[in-house]
Design a protein with these regions (language model features):
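Domain-length cofactor-binding catalytic modules of enzymes
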Residues: 1-216
Length: 216
């Protein structure tokens, strides 16, 4: 394959290498899903020790940074496509057959996490997103600087103290990790969410502020 740029390296889907890539990616998605299930179980156990009758039900679980085989309208035809979502997640609109029955009339939940010090958002996919972006929306604001740059600008201990003054508790074994994830190292999540809604890629449902943040 002749490439106009080495960054566009690719492999035909039906080639052995292409199939190996898809298999490895799907294994990674399954690993991440299993990891989230384990974290959910541990959180439920922790809550049960203090609030034995608490019911922590899972609202939704969704993967991002994936490539999935989907049916979409291209022009006047329905086509089977491999949809790559990098820095993005599914945002299927109401009535899509891949949405769970209890969410069919609403649309697919879109979870957009903020930083340790900013809001996170719950959105839902739209019919317009299906037409414009193959049912896709952002899954976060994205970094405004590298982790290395963040550690040069912030100290983990100072970040923890500043967030504590705002009523946000941070728990992390690594102060360097906290510095890498400093709120200032990310773009404005509210501006990103507003832009996604203005573009009709997703619709805002709820805004949530952090109380406790656990960094691995």
């Amino acid at each position: 394959i002749t490439l106009p740029d080495r960054e566009l390296a690719c492999a035909p889907i039906d080639s052995p290498l292409g199939q190996e890539y898809l298999g490895a990616m799907r294994a990674a998605i399954n690993c991440a899903l299993a990891n989230r299930q384990i974290v959910t179980h541990l959180v439920r156990q922790a809550f049960a020790e203090i609030l034995p009758h608490a019911d922590l039900s899972l609202m939704y679980d969704v993967s991002h940074n994936t490539c999935k085989v989907e049916e979409h309208r291209v022009g006047n035809q329905s086509r089977r496509l491999f949809v790559h979502r990098k820095g993005a997640t599914r945002a299927f609109g109401p009535g899509h057959p891949d949405i769970p029955p209890d969410l069919q009339t609403i649309g697919q939940p879109v979870l957009i996490g903020g930083t340790m010090g900013t809001a996170s958002y719950l959105l839902v996919g739209t019919a317009e997103s299906m037409n414009m972006a193959y049912g896709s929306a952002c899954h976060g604001a994205g970094r405004s600087m590298s982790r290395h740059q963040a550690t040069r600008q912030w100290k983990g201990g100072k970040v923890i103290d500043d967030l504590a003054k705002e009523g946000i508790l941070i728990r992390s074994p690594s102060k360097r990790g906290v510095a890498e994830e400093a709120p200032g190292a990310y773009k404005d999540v509210t501006a990103v969410v507003d832009a996604a809604e203005a573009a009709q890629l997703a619709r805002k449902v709820a805004k949530m502020r952090p109380l406790i943040c656990i960094k691995g």
